[in-house]
Amino acid sequence: MTTTLKKVVAASMVGSVAEWYEFFLYGTASALVFGELFFQQTGNAIDGILAAFALYAVGFLARPLGGLVFGHYGDKIGRKKLLQISLIIVGITTFLMGCIPTFHQIGYWAPTLLVILRLIQGFAFGGEWGGAVILVSEHSPDDRRGYWASWPQTGVPLGNLVATLVLLLLSKNLSPEQFLDWGWRCAFWFSAVVVLIGLWIRKNVDDAEVFKEAQAKQQLLEKQQLGIIEVLKYHKKSVIAGIGARFAENILYYMVVTFSISYLKLVVHKDTSQILLLMFGAHLIHFFIIPFMGHLSDIFGRKPIYLIGAVLTAFWGFVGFPLMDTGNDWLIMLAIVLGLFIESMTYSPYSALMTELFPTHIRYTALSFCYQVAPIMAGSLAPLIALTLLKEFNSSIPISLYLVAASLISIVSILLVKETKGRSLAFKD
């Protein structure tokens, strides 16, 4: 591993850490405090959480637009510059979320301000993942790309670990009333520290040579198409596969990490500190699983690992929820880790697979579009759908069947594309 690659990996990871710190923070706050603080009370605790989860989904709506804008300019002027801008916007909006007054103080302005900040933040998030993954992939050797390109994905458990640790420290040292009143806000304000560290790390990295060469070739062309038009015109099958392939991973992840918090609180009756402690342990294990699965994709190929993970997704609900229902901490931990292990089989190879499917001059646009469109139909709605099914049927079986449907979509999608392991990133440039 060269010094340059080390810097690039660190620079790509830090944005992902900031992104997932906020997302786990918001998902946890939705389940624990937002329903009570920012929405009119109906007397039913589930209704408030449903409203918070609906707003959780709103943040995903702006992501595809952000992906297109950041992707277009990232393909034209460079990955690094756009990654810096996205990180700054993420930091500002997350900090401001911690400043919003409650529904009791300003009425409907509270959820309105939350919606506005979620949309702006979602726009910035739209350009983060694609740029980070591409930055690493374009610096990586062809035969080890699965491993190195999976490292930005470890920002997911790392961000969640930091968020869980912050929330755990706050909930352990504050009374429930103090945590509800002001403690949760400190967690959002802490995001500024994460972002400042990220900006400092990213200032010393540069775009890869494969991008600079492709950029020079494109500048010689008399007429260039808008990136997304070229993506949709010449790469339809890859786009469909890229979007559909995320359903199993995306829905399973939000089921295991976000919805399970509500499930453990409402059905299993675990307290906040217990849930956060279990999540902390699971995220720590998840951090090591992700690069391992990326390494396996370098050995066996992207598709075999992906397909096994997609198939296993169909079975998690029938195993995971009964394990949680026991109320035993070790079995609950097993359910969460099992879900994250399966999710990693589809999440880890995705970055290398998608990078290898598209040519350099439209890669940022294509990756960001596929990655950000999928959650609108998948993960963004997963906690809301799961909680609604739980409310209507008072059973985890319908939720498990929902996971089966997601699994089938991803299996069909991944079968649409050819194996890409070992492919040069200059293959179409």
UniProtKB/Swiss-Prot annotation:
Deletion consequences: Disruption of the gene increases susceptibility to fosfomycin. Disruption also results in impaired biofilm formation and decreased virulence.
Swiss-Prot/TrEMBL keywords: Antibiotic resistance, Cell inner membrane, Cell membrane, Membrane, Transmembrane, Transmembrane helix, Transport
Subcellular location: Cell inner membrane
GO terms of molecular function: transmembrane transporter activity
UniProt keyword Isomerase present: no
GO CC list: plasma membrane
Domain of life where this protein originates: Bacteria
Transmembrane segments: 19-39, 49-69, 83-103, 106-126, 150-170, 179-199, 239-259, 275-295, 304-324, 330-350, 369-389, 397-417
Means of activity regulation: Inhibited by the efflux inhibitor and energy decoupler carbonyl cyanide m-chlorophenylhydrazone (CCCP).
Biological-process GO terms, alphabetical: response to antibiotic
Predominant location: membrane
Keyword RNA-binding: no
Topology term for the membrane: Multi-pass membrane protein
Family under the similarity heading: Belongs to the major facilitator superfamily.
Function recorded in the entry: Efflux pump that mediates resistance to fosfomycin. Probably also involved in the secretion of biofilm matrix that contributes to the pathogenicity.
Name of the protein this chain belongs to: Fosfomycin resistance protein AbaF
Protein source organism: Acinetobacter baumannii (strain ATCC 17978 / DSM 105126 / CIP 53.77 / LMG 1025 / NCDC KC755 / 5377)
